[in-house]
């Protein structure tokens, strides 16, 4: 009798004295602090890193290009993940409980899905933009205009938000797995299981665009390699020691394609394990251990923090823009016309 009582006392609940409360599986103080630091850092990096990207592109007139507007909108999606999703997921992952109410649980799930699919669709648009820029640079300015970029942005957001909210607010994700949903439902939990059909659809919505992007970037790099060889073969015949304007533009476009290709690859590597696991779970009665699932989810979340780091490493203009923003010199009246592509930018 005493033994049974001690076992009952050992079980922690998310909400004490509440019927049907979820069971809490707390970490010891050391690992708990480390998890909060690591996961919280990801949220801060995603929020502030992508905020810097948006400010840089929207403030500096030299960056007002169709490609950069797509990048700014992509950064907006990742910024929203860092603000509306990751902080709450941090608490849920560390405390193993959801303390933010049922209403925001549903919003959180919709935000999570919407912003992540928005990132995917933006990357698809960017890959098409880079393909045209590298393979047909002469007509690129007339083919992929700011208006075309705007249409891509609107459609990416519209389909992402419509798809996500229609799934979770109609209950379509729960059809056929009602017993599982009842078994998982408890006070302090926030699960949104998907049935097999929706999991398969989500996987295809991820897989098909990514296969297309891999194909497009492969074509881009083949063309870029051919262009580089052509420039090298004609370099000795050049009358001027300095590069021609056309060559400089071609180099810039190839570098942009390479950088954005790396961003696409990072997205693929971050997402693929999670989606493969989701498909396996849907067809094998959700066999994934909770800690494995948490690791896969946070690999996806951390992708939202990676793009600013990629830009900072490969884009010289982004580093210069950050210096101007952080130093406060961006507040000067003429700062928006700063030449970020010159060898040296006046920052004094």
Curated annotation (Swiss-Prot):
Membrane-traversing stretches: 34-58, 69-90, 106-128, 149-170, 197-218, 257-280, 294-314
The keyword Ribosomal protein is annotated on this UniProt entry: no
Gene Ontology cellular component annotations, sorted alphabetically: plasma membrane
Superkingdom to which the source organism belongs: Eukaryota
Residue intervals annotated with topology Cytoplasmic: 59-68, 129-148, 219-256, 315-348
Main location: membrane
Disulfide bonds: 22-186, 105-190
Membrane topology: Multi-pass membrane protein
Glycosylated residues in this chain: 4, 19
Region (Extracellular Loop 2 (ECL2)): 174-187
GO function term, MF aspect, one: G protein-coupled receptor activity
Keyword Membrane: yes
Gene Ontology annotations of biological process type: adenylate cyclase-activating G protein-coupled receptor signaling pathway; G protein-coupled receptor signaling pathway; sensory perception of smell
Extracellular compartment spans: 1-33, 91-105, 171-196, 281-293
Localization (cell): Cell membrane
Keyword terms, alphabetized: Cell membrane, Disulfide bond, G-protein coupled receptor, Glycoprotein, Membrane, Receptor, Transducer, Transmembrane, Transmembrane helix
SUPFAM superfamilies in alphabetical order: Family A G protein-coupled receptor-like (SSF81321)
List of residues binding spermidine: 112-113
Family listed: Belongs to the G-protein coupled receptor 1 family.
UniProt remark on domains: In addition to the well known disulfide bond common to G-protein coupled receptor 1 family, trace amine-associated receptors (TAARs) contain an unique disulfide bond (Cys-22-Cys-186) connecting the N-terminus to the extracellular Loop 2 (ECL2), which is required for agonist-induced receptor activation.
Function: Olfactory receptor specific for trace amines, such as N,N-dimethylcyclohexylamine (DMCHA) and beta-phenylethylamine (beta-PEA). In contrast to mouse and rat orthologs, not activated by triethylamine, cadaverine (CAD) or spermidine. Trace amine compounds are enriched in animal body fluids and act on trace amine-associated receptors (TAARs) to elicit both intraspecific and interspecific innate behaviors. Trace amine-binding causes a conformation change that triggers signaling via G(s)-class of G alpha proteins (GNAL or GNAS).
Protein name (database record): Trace amine-associated receptor 9
